[in-house]
Amino acid sequence: MSGSTLDKGKVTLTGAEETLLITLFARAKDAESPNPVLNDQYSAQVVSRIRDQGYNFSRTTLDRSDSSFFTSLVATRARVLDICCEQFLERNPGPATIIHLACGMDSRSLRLKWQGEGRLWIDADRQDVIKLRRQIMDEPAPERGEYRLTDPDIHDDAWLRDYNVPTDRPVLVLFEGLTPYLTRDEVVSLLRRITNHFRDSGVNGEIRFDAPGSISYFLINYVFNKPLRSMGTQFTWYMDDPRELETHVPGLKYRERMFVLHDYARLGNYGWLAGFLLRVADWFNIGGRIGSGYGYEF
C-alpha cells in the first residue's frame, strides 16, 4: 500500500523491533524543538535516512495529534540515562565496560565522551535491528578504547561468554525500552544471566533500565494502543515494586529510582500545569505505578 500512513518502505522491522522507531522519532522531534531536552542531533539524521528508505513515520504517531508531551517524556528519560552513564564513568575513570542492550538506533555511544584506555562500549540488539543500524548509522570515531556492535541472543545463557565480554573491569549494563516487551520470566532470567556472569569472576557492576508500572501497562495496552497495535505488539510486563527482583536474582541489590515524576517536570518541557500534576503524582507515591528508571548493583 505505497504512500499510505502504514507504508514501511524497505524497512523490515516488525513487532517490538519496530517500536524503536517511535522513540527515535521522538528524540528527533526533541532535537528540532526550540528548547530541546536531549538535543540528539544524530537522531534527526537517522530519521531522514530511514525516510529515504520509504518508511512513513506516521506509523509512530497514530494516537497523538500533538506529540509534544510524549516527545519530552522520551527525551527526558534518555537524558537521565545519559547522566547515569556519565556518573558511572566518573566513578570508574580507568578501564570499564558499558553494555547497551536493545540499543536500536540510539546514538548514546556517539553523544557521550566515553573513550579512554581500557574502555569498551558494546551496542547490542537483534539481528534485523543491527543490520539496519549498520546501513544508516555511523560508529564512534576510532579513539582510545574499543567499540563493538553486536547481535547476541540475550536469552542464551552463554552469550556474554561467547561474545568475550571482559570480566576484569567494572561494568554498566543499561537498556531502555526493552523490558515492556519481555515476560516476567525473561526479565528475571536476563538479570540472573548478567549478574552471575560478572559476580562469578569477582566483578562489581551496575544495571540500569526503565520499566512501566501497572498504570502505564494498562494505558498503553488498552487506551493509547494504536501505534503498538499497528506494529503487532503490546506491553507484556510491568513492575510496581523494584525490590521484588532482589528475591529472584541472587546478588542483585536495588539502589535507586533513577528518575521520579518530578525529574520529568524539572528536566522536561511540559508547561506549568503538566509539571504540577507530575509532582502531585509523586507526592501521592504513585510514580512507580506509572513507570520509572531503576538502578541495581551486584
From Swiss-Prot:
The UniProt record lists the keyword Magnesium: no
EC number: 2.1.1.-
Its job: S-adenosyl-L-methionine-dependent methyltransferase; part of the gene cluster that mediates the biosynthesis of diterpenoid pyrones. The first step of the pathway is the synthesis of the alpha-pyrone moiety by the polyketide synthase dpfgA via condensation of one acetyl-CoA starter unit with 3 malonyl-CoA units and 2 methylations. The alpha-pyrone is then combined with geranylgeranyl pyrophosphate (GGPP) formed by the GGPP synthase dpfgD through the action of the prenyltransferase dpfgC to yield a linear alpha-pyrone diterpenoid.
Application of this enzyme or protein: Diterpenoid pyrones display various biological activities and FDDP E shows anti-HIV activity. FDDP D and FDDP E show also inhibitory activity of 42-mer-amyloid beta aggregation that is involved in the pathogenesis of Alzheimer's disease.
GO MF terms held by the record: methyltransferase activity
Similarity comment: Belongs to the methyltransferase superfamily.
GO biological process, one term: terpenoid biosynthetic process
Keyword terms, alphabetized: Methyltransferase, S-adenosyl-L-methionine, Transferase
Top class in the EC scheme: transferase
UniProt signal peptide: none
Organism: Gibberella zeae (strain ATCC MYA-4620 / CBS 123657 / FGSC 9075 / NRRL 31084 / PH-1) (Wheat head blight fungus)
Record-given protein name: S-adenosyl-L-methionine-dependent methyltransferase dpfgK
Matches recorded under Pfam families: LCM
Pathway: Secondary metabolite biosynthesis; terpenoid biosynthesis
